[in-house]
């Protein structure tokens, strides 16, 4: 096996439901947006805002060591729930938005767009995690962020390692194009999908994260070898699921790139 070949070896990604996925990269164990609560309702100011409809496929006790949490944002329970907040206390480093880093305190670091941090690998060497744009709704960031808040995506790179993109709650293909210009080809894209909408509440019911067709388009833009979709099940506000993802990627001729995590 040549060194070039090793960069395309497929590493497993375990998907727990919602936006939560676990993978090992350069010897470090990374977890995206931790959500391990049981099904139930979430309230704000006495109003129900979200409903979780299914339990995770495993518990936080199943995780083993977690070195880094990649947290796209801390303000919404479908990205960081009550059990997820408890978990953060035991994780050495949480990377998140600049505002989230200030809210979460000592073990959290916020990354602005294109800001990078280098992390030591257990066997020597380093990986680089770069914060990348994510817009949690339709339109320009300056119009969206005051309503849905800051969100950050992540790109992971390292010598001899595949490039990995974690989109976070992003609805903008223009943001994906910016990321592709800097980092393509991406080996593995963990794409948040599900076509979440809040008709009559947010943005006239427009998408606040990619739908399935857009996820397939994002895969094409990124030139990615593999897409691991997350954030498409277990919550009532997700309007598209597994079947829509498979259909969209099949229509786009990309279904062979879709990794639904059936073998966990």
List PLM regions with ranges:
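Pre-active-site segment of Zn-dependent metallo-hydrolases
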Residues: 2-3, 28-71, 82-86, 137-143, ...
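Metallo-beta-lactamase
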Residues: 2-8, 66-77, 91-162, 227, 247-264
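Conserved catalytic scaffold of divalent metal-dependent phosphoesterases
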Residues: 31-39, 111-119, 126-137, 187-199
């Amino acid at each position: 096996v040549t060194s070039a070949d090793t960069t395309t070896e497929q590493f497993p990604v375990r998907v727990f439901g919602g936006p939560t996925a676990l993978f090992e990269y350069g010897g470090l164990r990374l977890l995206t947006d931790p959500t391990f609560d049981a099904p139930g309702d979430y309230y704000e100011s006495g109003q129900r805002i979200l409903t979780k409809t299914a339990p995770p496929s495993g518990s936080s006790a199943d995780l083993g060591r977690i070195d880094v949490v990649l947290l796209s944002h801390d303000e919404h329970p479908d990205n960081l729930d009550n059990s997820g907040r408890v978990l953060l206390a035991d994780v050495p480093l949480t990377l998140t938005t600049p505002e989230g880093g200030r809210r979460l305190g000592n073990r959290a670091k916020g990354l602005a767009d294109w800001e990078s941090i280098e992390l030591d690998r257990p066997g020597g060497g380093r990986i680089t995690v770069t914060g990348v744009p994510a817009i949690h709704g339709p339109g320009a960031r300056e119009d969206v962020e005051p309503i849905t808040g800051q969100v950050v995506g992540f790109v992971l790179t390292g010598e001899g390692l595949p490039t990995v993109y974690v989109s976070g709650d992003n609805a903008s293909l223009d943001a994906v194009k910016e990321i592709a210009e800097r980092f393509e080809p991406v080996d593995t894209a963990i794409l948040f999908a599900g076509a979440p909408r809040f008709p009559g509440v947010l943005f006239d019911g427009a998408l606040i994260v990619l739908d399935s067709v857009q996820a397939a388009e994002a895969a094409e833009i990124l030139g990615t070898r593999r897409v691991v979709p997350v954030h498409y099940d277990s919550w009532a506000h997700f309007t598209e699921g597994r079947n829509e993802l498979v259909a969209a990627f099949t229509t786009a001729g990309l279904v062979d790139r879709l990794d639904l995590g059936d073998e966990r």
